[in-house]
From Swiss-Prot:
Transmembrane feature ranges: 650-670
Gene (UniProt): Sema6a
Superkingdom of source: Eukaryota
Family: Belongs to the semaphorin family.
Organism: Mus musculus
SUBUNIT field: Active as a homodimer or oligomer. The SEMA6A homodimer interacts with a PLXNA2 homodimer, giving rise to a heterotetramer. Interacts with EVL.
Name of this chain's protein: Semaphorin-6A
Keyword Disulfide bond on entry: yes
GO molecular function: identical protein binding; semaphorin receptor binding; transmembrane signaling receptor activity
Glycosylation sites: 33, 49, 65, 282, 434, 461
Stretches assigned to the Sema domain: 24-512
Disulfide bond annotation, renumbered to this chain: 107-117, 135-144, 258-369, 283-328, 477-506, 515-533, 521-568, 525-542
């Protein structure tokens, strides 16, 4: 089954490949190293310095009266064509026509470059035997003149060249003199918007196409105009109006106008063509879906081939498509028959174009010339009825396309990187003038030479690719290092056997045949099948055959049969000091190439070299260097150049290998990328897992262990003894599990630099409902602070004794005591006391605080009975401005009750007893530590405890907050009617881990940010009896 499927695929591929014709190979190839010996014209006169050159900008060339006219920028050169092929070409005369300075200034004012503001000769025609008609752009102000042919002197007045010559040299134009009238096609405005087919001069009225009507002309590019019969035919390409829905589709067209057209009536088509019709040219490869060549490049004049009048045209693919060119032949009778067929119309702007029925076509038929045999009663076109004129105005397009001869291209060239743009035809080639040879010029400076074959039907049936020539001479034609290889025009002179090829910077004279290359080798001369070459018996060499030559010669154009002819060994002929030979008998010794050479009559084919084993690469043997064989004879290689094709098999193998290697490399790259991503994902997952485990044991707050509940000394201190988090896994510690949570720091070896700071602690909304035990402690502490008189020195190691610290389930101590060097600890920390000792110490402190409170009360009562009232009044008149902080002890999303925080109500005062308040912001924690430690050690049960002071939290600045602060207050009611409420503040502490070894007292890290909130005074919520105040 598989072999059958493979055979079917091969058959389909063969059929598909046979659908499109393959390019033929030339019999002979002439490279630039050989053609550089041809004469070149660069604008010099005989005897002038050839090193100095000026830019020519050649626009066109024309042969008239055995003289070659070269139309360039600001000049027209004349060259004598009756010279040999070995002589240099010089101009015999030079006509200079430069633009006036006023026109140049106007051109520059219009925004054009100075190189564009010249007079480019675009129209050069023979008006009659004595007059030369010339038109130029004249710095974007086209003008025309008449010159005498013999002297090139101007005569008559200069007149406007509008509608006869374009404004810009880049715009295409055509012009033709017929019966003394000038038929031109170009643009009529500066912006090249209005395209026109125009008739002027002569005794007939001036006519033009309808202005700005896309049905008549839509962005045309004019190529050629020919005079045939009663009509003038214009060949051009334009945007197809019938295919507007498909975008800008370009079609080749041919249009006709009658020579005797006098225009329409005063009502319809006045001073406009009444015979203008246009049709599409069809040049396509037939098949189920035709492959069209729509870009018309060049058209010949009407030539007669085998008794028929035809025109040959070159077409190409669009410039944004794959390169390809074709040559199609059209019979003039077929063109005339299309204009007698059906018309095409569009009934509405959105509808498609459809044929017009014959019954709707008015009489007389539009497009016919007045005064013809079918329209004898209409002497001129002015007499046509309005129906005919209106119909021709709205229906200029024909429905059918002009078919090419044999309904397919006569020649194809698709496997090259250039397009064919020019054409020249010799329809009387050979000594008997019975052959047709076509020369095609490309945009790369390459000339292709073909022989038209006549089939059994008596007409063109194909072509024979005779020769390929690279005629551009970079040494002489390049200007300022720029090589412009576009061929601007070609003119063939059969009498001199020359083809003049014009580039923008030079003109090269190329012989029609290279017969001297064959020398004395008869086999190669016959095998070349060139109508211009033949084997001359008298001289025993291959020579050029002029028309009607009387020399005895041998040719075989049809078959090129070389049977019975001997091989050509070491035969060469010298030309201009260079020896040449087509057959490399001594330089290529392989048998394969030799057999191929002999089978074609001595013509070398590069396929033989490719198939020959052990042969050298022909692509590398294209250099222009001559080489010398063993016998001293200089040979030259004429193999294909680097821009030729490679074998299909090699190309297929290269494509397959490239595909396989690309697939392998792509797989490797994809595997590496996937593996790298997989590793990255694994690393990220492992890091997230480790981070999750580390977060489970993260600390919400860390505090020092030593000196927490009373005893600041330890018998056996150990370093780095600190408390573990008081909040474990987001829950507050309770008395039942407090002992479990207090762990030695030496078991963890925590890094002190990693301890949390107030800035890095997330904030949560704090609940406002306080705990009852914490509220009582705050109230008692507030009373003690309010009743103090003096403050101890800043450096005193006395610490105030708080009211009894209650071990409530939600209570967190606000201060911890750390060992200091002044007490002899030598930077060591004490062990954590046991839970029972902590409870006992708390009880002792409670009793001491109660006794101290009673002592202060009695002391105040003995001094002033109304002291408490005054104190309350002072307190109410000047409440302390202490900021309220809000913080959290857990992760984001959780909230803690206010009772779970360590709170303290502080009152700040001055040395005057309870009358003024002053905020105190210690500059560092060491000062506060010394002060509080000393107060606690020395003044626990004495009356001096009235001087106890509550300082601000650690880590604050030296200055108080500038904005008013909100305070949490309680009310103190007096027994007097005028008693005032005392508002006291509760201030949390902020602690920074700056220097643990130097501080004797360390507060727990504050859980509230240091930002000044808005001021707020809470209402009185807790009442105190009068006897609770200081009396």
């Amino acid at each position: 089954m598989r072999p059958a499927a493979l055979l079917l695929c091969l058959t389909l591929l063969h059929c598909a490949g046979a659908g499109f014709p393959e390019d033929s190979e030339p019999i002979s190839i002439s490279h630039g190293n050989y053609t550089k010996q041809y004469p070149v014209f660069v604008g010099h006169k005989p005897g002038r310095n050839t090193t100095q050159r000026h830019r020519l900008d050649i626009q066109m060339i024309m042969i008239m009266n055995r003289t070659l006219y070269v139309a360039a920028r600001d000049h027209i050169y004349t060259v004598d064509i009756d010279t040999s092929h070995t002589e240099e070409i010089y101009c015999s005369k030079k006509l200079t026509w430069k633009s006036r300075q006023a026109d140049v200034d106007t051109c520059r004012m219009k925004g054009k470059h100075k190189d564009e503001c010249h007079n480019f000769i675009k129209v050069l025609l023979k008006k009659n035997d004595d007059t030369l008609f010339v038109c130029g752009t004249n710095a974007f102000n086209p003008s025309c003149r008449n010159y005498r042919v013999d002297t090139l002197e101007t005569f008559g007045d200069e007149f406007s060249g509008m509608a006869r010559c374009p404004y810009d040299a880049k715009h295409a134009n055509i012009a033709l003199f017929a019966d003394g009238k000038l038929y031109s096609a170009t643009v009529t405005d500066f912006l090249a918007i209005d395209a026109v087919i125009y008739r002027s001069l002569g005794d007939s009225p001036t006519l033009r196409t309808v202005k700005h009507d896309s049905k008549w002309l839509k962005e045309p590019y004019f190529v050629q105009a020919v005079d045939y019969g009663d009509y003038i035919y214009f060949f051009f390409r334009e945007i197809a109006v019938e295919y507007n829905t498909m975008g800008k589709v370009v079609f080749p067209r041919v249009a006709q106008v009658c020579k005797n057209d006098m225009g329409g009536s005063q009502r319809v088509l006045e001073k406009q063509w009444t015979s203008f019709l246009k049709a599409r040219l069809n040049c396509s490869v037939p098949g189920d879906s035709h492959f069209y060549f729509n870009i018309l490049q060049a058209v010949t004049d009407v030539i007669r081939i085998n008794g028929r009048d035809v025109v040959l045209a070159t077409f190409s693919t669009p410039y944004n498509s794959i390169p390809g060119s074709a040559v199609c032949a059209y019979d003039m009778l077929d063109i005339a028959n299309v204009f007698t067929g059906r018309f095409k119309e569009q009934k509405s702007p959105d509808s498609t174009w459809t044929p017009v029925p014959d019954e709707r076509v008015p009489k007389p038929r539009p497009g016919c010339c007045a005064g013809s045999s079918s329209l004898e009663k209409y002497a001129t076109s002015n007499e046509f009825p309005d129906d005919t004129l209106n119909f021709i105005k709205t229906h200029p397009l024909m429905d059918e396309a002009v078919p090419s001869i044999i309904n397919r291209p006569w020649f194809l060239r698709t496997m090259v990187r250039y397009r064919l743009t020019k054409i020249a035809v010799d329809n009387a080639a050979g000594p008997y003038q019975n052959h047709t040879v076509v020369f095609l010029g490309s945009e790369k400076g390459i000339i292709l030479k073909f022989l038209a074959r006549i089939g059994s039907s008596g007409f063109l049936n194909g072509s024979l690719f005779l020769e390929e020539m690279n005629v551009y001479n970079p040494e002489k034609c390049s200007y300022d290092g720029v090589e412009d290889k576009r061929i601007m025009g070609m003119q063939l002179d059969r009498a001199s056997g020359s083809l003049y090829v014009a580039f923008s910077t030079c003109v090269i004279k190329v012989p029609l045949g290279r017969c001297e290359r064959h020398g004395k080798c008869k086999k190669t001369c016959i095998a070349s099948r060139d109508p211009y070459c033949g084997w001359v018996r008298e001289s025993g060499s291959c020579a050029h055959l002029s028309p009607l030559s009387r020399l005895t010669f041998e040719q075989d154009i049809e078959r090129g049969n070389t049977d019975g002819l001997g091989d050509c060994h070491n035969s060469f002929v010298a030309l201009n000091g260079h020896a040449s030979s087509l057959y490399p008998s001594t330089t290529t010794s392989d048998s394969a190439s030799r057999d191929g050479y002999e089978s074609r009559g001595g013509m070398l084919d590069w396929n033989d070299l490719l198939e020959a084993p052990g042969s050298t690469d022909p692509l590398g043997a294209v250099s222009s260097h001559n080489h010398q064989d063993k016998k001293g004879v200089i040979r030259e290689s004429y193999l294909k150049s680097n821009d030729q094709l490679v074998p299909v098999t090699l190309l297929a193998i290269a494509v397959i290998l490239a595909f396989v290697m690309g697939a392998v490399f792509s797989g490797i790259i994809v595997y590496c990328v996937c593996d790298h991503r997989r590793k990255d994902v694994a690393v990220v997952q492992r890091k997230e897992k480790e981070l999750t485990h580390s977060r489970r044991g993260s600390m919400s707050s860390v505090t020092k262990l030593s000196g927490l509940f009373g005893d600041t000394q330890s018998k056996d201190p150990k370093p780095e003894a600190i408390l573990t988090p008081l909040m474990h896994n987001g829950k507050l510690a309770t008395p039942s599990n407090t002992a479990k949570m207090l762990i030695k720091a030496d078991q963890h070896h925590l890094d002190l630099t990693a301890l949390p700071t107030p800035e890095s602690t997330p904030t949560l909304q704090q609940k406002r409902k306080p705990n009852r035990g914490s509220r009582e402690w705050e109230r008692n502490q507030n009373i003690i602070n309010a009743c103090t008189k003096d403050m101890p020195p800043m450096g005193s190691p006395v610490i105030p004794t708080d009211l009894p610290l209650r071990a409530s389930p939600s209570h967190i101590p606000s201060v911890v005591v750390l060992p200091i060097t002044q007490q002899g600890y030598q930077h060591e920390y004490v062990d954590q006391p046991k839970m029972s000792e902590v409870v006992a110490q708390m009880a002792l402190e409670d009793q001491a605080a109660t006794l101290e409170y009673k002592t202060i009360k009695e002391h105040l009562s003995s001094k002033s009975p109304n002291h408490g009232v005054n104190l309350v009044e002072n307190l109410d008149s000047l409440p302390p401005k202490v900021p309220q902080r809000e913080a959290s002890l857990g992760p984001p999303g959780t909230s803690l009750s206010q009772t779970g925080l360590s709170k303290r109500l502080e009152m700040q005062h001055s040395s005057s007893y309870g009358l003024e308040y002053k905020r105190s912001y210690p500059t560092n924690s060491l000062t506060r530590s010394h002060q509080t430690t000393t107060l606690k050690r020395n003044n626990t049960n004495s009356s001096n405890s009235s001087h106890l002071s509550r300082n601000q939290s650690f880590g604050r600045g030296d200055n108080p907050p500038p904005a008013p602060q909100r305070v949490d207050s309680i009310q103190v009611h007096s027994s007097q009617p005028s008693g005032q409420a005392v508002t006291v503040s509760r201030q949390p502490s902020l602690n920074a881990y700056n220097s643990l070894t130097r501080s004797g007292l360390k507060r727990t890290p504050s859980l509230k940010p240091d930002v000044p909130p808005k001021p707020s005074f809470a209402p009185l919520s807790t009442s105190m009896k009068p006897n609770d105040a200081c009396t």
